[in-house]
């Protein structure tokens, strides 16, 4: 009787430890997958936005007034977005709304981030956005994004406009 009791107790301890390790590994796997999703989506987002901003044109066409100034390259909107004329001569805007990064282009609005991700911060900084400053336009943008597993990433990049900023 004592031997059976000891055997059951040892089996219970080993089973409990094994189950704990298994649950811990599942939790780590879920966190790892959430981090990978966060990195993948953030990488895509940075590449997409960088390309669009790099290919922007000066707002100097008759009849197309995307920006409030004359011959301006970019414009910061309400501290949480950037607006410009893209290479297809459409007004394009990236902005933060309800923890989601959105894009407005050609009259339509689309989400750039998926629902499980929350954009906590989106800041932009402009250098050389006007024609008269003799600087090639540069945009720095900063993103802080959090996944549903509470993994956060902070990332910043600076892009210069592809087209030379010369007077015409």
Write out the residue ranges for each language-model feature.
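Short, hydrophobic secondary-structure boundary micro-motifs
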Residues: 14, 61-62
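Short, cationic motifs built from Arg/Lys/His that form the positively charged side of catalytic pockets
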Residues: 43, 54, 100-103, 162
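Aliphatic-rich helix starts adjacent to a transmembrane/signal segment
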Residues: 1-54
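Short linear sequence signals and composition-biased patches located at protein termini or domain-edge surfaces
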Residues: 109-168
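Type IV pilin-like appendage domain
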Residues: 62-131
